[in-house]
């Protein structure tokens, strides 16, 4: 998920470069015949780095494929989506960016909301939380934007580090403001909100808090492992997904559990009997 100003988050593996070799002590100038060895060493290091990256990516994909219930999330960054080209049988849930901070509204939200629902998708909305804005204002922005529908997924609050809002609140103050928004959305929509977050943000800010709030974890290097080992509900395993009908790369997600677990989750939200794309019980 992304803010209105920042590009999408990608974890990148740092690889060594040839520059470190040239920075070593220059006791003597190597002869021309030694240069091919430096080039060869650089090539070997590059191949090793690419191999490690490929290993992590392949294992991450294989791990995500263990979960049968798949979905994706989008915002205006994905442009004009051809919803009729995407199967609600293949992707069981979709989350749309609705709002950010106290006043930003995603310009594609209403269009995506209407068209995705028309195609039979189970749809929910998320809010990108600004750490330097108070929870009440942000909750109001979301409530004014996202319709209250009995067949929509629970609201999501996207919690991650924000370089424009450093040291505005202490951890205790921040948790208090997050609690305000959480409670406002719970009261308005009648559904327990979900927290989308990174491993780093959870381990530093959210650990041991909001224990009844479902977690949606962004982790691109393997299955999420959080401090205290809380159970996660959704896992965003890549931001480099490709779906026919979406003109850009897209975030892909899975639900933790089987098809039957998914049905149970939907039943708890009062959603099971409504959409036509649900699995047969």
Model-predicted regions and their roles:
Residues 59, 64-81, 97-180, 186-191:
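Substrate-binding cleft of extracellular glycoside hydrolase catalytic domains
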Residues 2-6, 10, 16-18, 22-24, ...:
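Functionally critical loop-and-helix segments that line ligand-binding/catalytic clefts
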Residues 26-47:
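N-terminal Sec-pathway targeting helices
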Residues 190-203:
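Aromatic-lined carbohydrate-recognition surfaces of secreted/lumenal glycan-active proteins
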Residues 46-55:
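Hydrophobic alpha-helical membrane-insertion segments, chiefly the h-region
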Residues 135, 201-208:
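Glycine-rich, charge-decorated loop segments at or immediately adjacent to ligand/cofactor-binding or catalytic sites
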């Amino acid at each position: 998920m992304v803010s209105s100003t920042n590009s999408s988050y990608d974890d990148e593996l740092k690889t060594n470069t040839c520059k470190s070799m040239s920075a070593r002590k220059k006791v003597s100038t190597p002869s021309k015949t030694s240069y091919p060895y430096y080039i060869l060493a650089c090539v070997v290091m590059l191949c090793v780095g690419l191999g490690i990256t490929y290993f992590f990516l392949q294992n991450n994909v294989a791990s995500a494929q263990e979960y049968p219930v798949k979905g994706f999330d989008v915002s205006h960054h994905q442009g004009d989506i051809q919803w009729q080209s995407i199967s609600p049988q293949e992707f069981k849930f979709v989350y749309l960016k609705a709002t950010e901070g106290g006043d930003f509204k995603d310009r594609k939200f209403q269009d995506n909301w209407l068209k995705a629902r028309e195609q039979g998708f189970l749809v929910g909305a998320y809010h990108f939380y600004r750490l330097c804005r108070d929870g009440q204002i942000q909750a109001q922005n979301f409530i004014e934007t996202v319709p209250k529908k009995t067949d929509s997924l629970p609201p999501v609050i996207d919690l991650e580090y924000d370089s424009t809002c450093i040291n505005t609140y202490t951890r205790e103050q921040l948790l208090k403001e997050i609690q305000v928004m959480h409670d406002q959305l719970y009261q308005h929509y009648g559904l327990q909100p979900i927290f989308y977050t990174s491993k780093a943000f959870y381990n530093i800010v959210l650990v041991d808090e909001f224990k009844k709030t479902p977690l949606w974890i962004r982790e691109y290097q393997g299955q999420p492992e959080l401090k205290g080992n809380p159970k996660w509900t959704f896992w965003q395993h890549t931001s480099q997904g490709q779906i026919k009908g979406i003109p850009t790369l897209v975030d892909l997600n899975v639900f933790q559990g089987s098809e039957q677990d998914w049905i149970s989750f939907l039943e708890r939200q009062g959603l099971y009997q409504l959409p036509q794309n649900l699995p047969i019980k």
